[in-house]
Amino acid sequence: HRDIPAVARIAAQNTLLNRFALEDILRAVMTPDAPHADIAALFAAQKACFASGITRPVPHRLDQLRRLRRAILAHEQDIEAALQSDLGKCRTEAYMCEIGMVLSELGYLLRRTRRYCRDTHVLTPLAQFPARSFIRHDPMGVVLIMSPWNYPFLLTIEPLLGALAGGNCCILKPSKDAPATSAIIRQICAECFPLEEVAIVEGGRTENQALLDQPFDKIFFTGSSHVGQEVLRRAAEHLTPVTLELGGKSPVIVAKDADLTLAARRIAFGKLLNAGQTCVAPDYVLVAREVEDAFVAALQKQFDQLCPDPLHSAEYVHIVNQKHFDRLTGLMASGQIVYGGSIDPAALRIAPTILRNVSPDSPVMQEEIFGPILPILPVSGIDEAIAFAAARPHPLACYLFTKDRAVQRRVLDTLAFGGGCINDTIIHLVTSRMPFGGVGHSGMGGYHGRDSFRCFTHDKSIVKKALWLDLPMRYTPYSKKKETLIRFFLK
């Protein structure tokens, strides 16, 4: 399933790789305990592959994407089983939130990659006449994609699509907390790609550190802000450009004129999805005080309808591990539990929980919740809601429920956040036609669709000068006439 002779040929051309047996390189991606030397060798193999130019032709990129699509379709049930094993995701949620989104992005890029790869021709300034100006969209080189456990298939494969469309070689580092999904991704990559084009390194902190020792041409990281800061610090040692997809406390603002039933239903959906273990999940609600009681009642009703038996429902995801379960149960003490609060420690399940009488200084308001706990904070009006959200680090998302267009404009103009919705939650990231990304503490850079291609390419500006005419005004010695011409052209 791998073109071993191709790897051997590349190894033979690279003096660094001559120190390592091919079996050692293969072991680096096939086992979770790869030594640092093997990771360095794997990186060198991919650098040599990229230097050969094999990943640059557009037909090769499209063939990679088609092979990946066929493999995903062939292994769809295996992917569903892996997501069920790691997180307890039901088949529908696994397809809606992971497999289907990957296939949608794949189709989008298959239809457009050829166009994206074409040089972009631009007008040439008159002062540079005669010449042609154009922008090449060059691959970055060898890229590292580090993904989290909460959407382990989507958040590993979706950035890979942009990297392949951009003509890069890739090393994937999935989370150790989603081992079943990591295993099926490893199998798919082994079937689709030679090692020197796409490889997967499994493991934990040791492997992460060894990977960050390498001078990658691009790093794409999805995860917590704390780890993202460490990735950025390590990348700075090599001046490696980084895209960070982080998180934060994404607020929901419910104005007094909101449709409370619809707002409650859509907020409940956003919080129930993956049991709140979503980087853009509603984190807390700022609700107009005069409608607080009615909104909480509507929210309780929607939780009852959407997930009537959360501790036993096959459609409700469990918490990923004991560490996060203990953290979340500790946060439940930050306010008055007015709904939910039940837990099943053996199954790592926490029912959707509504908290009231929550202090802004309480533990639940100091960190991203990343679970099915929803604090409700009453505010006097839109001014207080905006001031509250603006005083905190920029979140990855913000959600506003109101019919008032002036309020909508004001929130969009005033608050800084990655992206969001008006009168809904979550759905802004379910498109290939808009970028998804954070700002400030919630991340830097974006991807999806064309922005995924841009994320993994470098715009190289080129001026191709004609040989038949060479205007003399730029050359010394300067004269009044030359200065007059320069002033004519440059104004």
What spans do the regions from the language model cover?
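Residues at or immediately preceding the N-termini of alpha-helices
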Residues: 39, 58, 76, 260, ...
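Residue-level signal for inorganic ion chemistry
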Residues: 61, 106, 167, 198, ...
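Conserved C-terminal structural/oligomerization subdomain of aldehyde/semialdehyde dehydrogenase
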Residues: 57, 253, 304, 349-491
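Rossmann-like NAD(P) dinucleotide-binding subdomain of oxidoreductase/dehydrogenase enzymes
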Residues: 126-262, 379
